[in-house]
């Protein structure tokens, strides 16, 4: 099990805040690229912390064309400025943060470029459009960007400990044992048969409210490739209720469910509910699946509908963390439009059936991916918007998230850090 986020996490986030405040003092007129070149139909302009790409020729599209003309890999593009550029999200960064490259189109493009993240410099690039149609795009009228984004790592399942919704008479509890009880991260293990009640849609384990449950968060002991039975944790006066949901709950006869957790005071991101209902926990730390939970929904061909996603998350150590939700780029059946997922808020997913057949969305189905990003101070977004057209020093990411370009990590810094010329630290990502 990983360590909890100690004081180092606070120091890392404090460094981010200082860096972002300093960047606001450097608002400058329209930026000029460090390097520009042409390859195929595209003109590439490389700035210190992003790449702007425009069509240097007329683009002729048709209704069967779902891909734009090809482009080189990130490594090949940036080699025009940094000949030895190389990068891999998995091995870059620190315990808390890493960086990935976000590809997305400008808001005023005539066709919508599906946004996606690139995790290493040699990755093949496929530029896919939504709802292709026959049209000519004039020279210089289609723009897209490559932007390095700080991602917040989330490789473990952290849940909030929620307040109990009703009073419960604790006449019988499950077995409870503990370990490391005299440390700041006590571990609790529950074992017993789930019970049901009218006010809970899921069965649950009922346990005594022992001192470790005074903490605010729990890291659930789960494993990659396994279905985690824990859905949510609630505490009330004298009791703790752990909602559980596994395929085994449907079988007849007594069932014993075992749950382990580490109780914590500080985390970077914690969910209200397990974001992986009835599905395997994906242990990569770079994104979190958005999985549907609810009654089945049928979407006719080429229709758009809205689906409620009632999960929320907290980012207690920083107000600068938000999430951008993007559809799976390889999904041939439906598309989820990108949007921002703010802490403490639920989502309304706008889902489009892009197939020729009706589709049914069921509980546990993966809809999209949430990438948690360090986007800077949310209170200054309105100010930034005023500079987008006038000074050209801010970028609007998918989901209408505005970032100031000088607050982004630079390509030079990424290259030096990854190749060992700079020792990675929380303040240099």
From Swiss-Prot:
InterPro entries for this protein: Herpes_Orf11 (IPR006882)
Keyword Thylakoid on entry: no
Pfam families found in the cross-reference section: Herpes_ORF11 (PF04797)
Keywords from the named record: Host-virus interaction, Inhibition of host innate immune response by virus, Interferon antiviral system evasion, Viral immunoevasion
GO biological process: negative regulation of gene expression; symbiont-mediated suppression of host innate immune response
Record has Glycosyltransferase as a keyword: no
Superkingdom of origin: Viruses
Quaternary structure and partners: Interacts with host IRF7; this interaction inhibits IRF7 dimerization, thereby altering its function in immunity. Interacts with BRLF1.
Function statement: Prevents the establishment of cellular antiviral state by blocking the cellular IRF7-mediated innate immunity. May also inhibit viral replication by modulating BRLF1 activity.
Entry similarity comment: Belongs to the epstein-barr virus LF2 family.
Protein name, UniProt field: Protein LF2
């Amino acid at each position: 099990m990983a360590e909890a986020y100690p004081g180092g996490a606070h120091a890392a986030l404090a460094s981010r805040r200082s860096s972002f405040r300093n960047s606001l003092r450097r608002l400058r007129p329209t930026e000029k690229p460090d390097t520009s070149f042409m390859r195929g139909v595209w003109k590439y302009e490389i700035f210190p912390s992003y790449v702007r790409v425009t069509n240097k020729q007329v683009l002729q599209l048709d209704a069967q064309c779902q891909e734009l003309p090809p482009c080189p890999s990130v490594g090949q593009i940036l080699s025009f400025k940094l000949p030895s550029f190389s990068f891999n999200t998995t091995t870059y960064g620190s315990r808390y943060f890493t960086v990935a490259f976000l590809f997305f189109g400008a808001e005023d493009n005539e066709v919508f470029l599906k946004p996606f993240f690139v995790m290493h410099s040699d990755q093949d690039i496929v530029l896919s459009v939504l709802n292709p149609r026959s049209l000519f795009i004039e020279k210089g009228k289609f723009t897209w960007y490559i932007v390095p984004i700080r991602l917040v790592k989330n490789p473990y399942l952290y849940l909030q400990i929620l307040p109990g919704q009703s009073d419960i008479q604790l006449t019988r509890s499950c077995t409870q044992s503990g370990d490391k009880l005299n440390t700041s991260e006590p571990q609790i293990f529950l074992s017993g048969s789930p019970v049901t009640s009218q006010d809970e849609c899921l069965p649950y384990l009922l346990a005594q409210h022992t001192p470790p449950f005074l903490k605010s968060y729990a890291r659930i002991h789960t494993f990659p490739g396994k279905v985690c039975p824990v859905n949510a944790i609630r505490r009330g006066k004298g009791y703790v209720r752990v909602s559980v949901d596994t395929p085994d709950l449907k079988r007849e006869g007594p069932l014993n469910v075992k749950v382990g957790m580490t109780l914590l005071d500080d985390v970077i991101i914690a969910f209200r509910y397990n974001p992986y209902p009835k599905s395997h926990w994906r242990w990569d730390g770079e994104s979190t699946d958005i999985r549907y939970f609810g009654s089945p929904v049928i979407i006719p061909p080429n229709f758009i509908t809205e689906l409620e996603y009632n999960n929320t998350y907290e980012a207690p150590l920083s107000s600068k963390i938000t999430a951008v939700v993007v559809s799976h780029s390889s999904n041939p059946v439906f598309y989820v439009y990108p949007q921002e997922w703010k802490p403490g808020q639920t989502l309304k997913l706008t889902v489009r059936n892009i197939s020729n057949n009706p589709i049914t969305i069921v509980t546990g189905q993966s809809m999209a991916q949430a990438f948690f990003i360090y986007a800077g101070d949310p209170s200054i977004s309105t100010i930034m918007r005023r500079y987008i057209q006038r000074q050209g020093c801010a970028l609007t990411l998918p989901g209408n998230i505005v970032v100031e370009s000088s607050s982004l990590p630079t390509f030079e810094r990424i290259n030096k850090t990854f190749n060992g010329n700079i020792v990675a630290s929380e303040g240099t990502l």
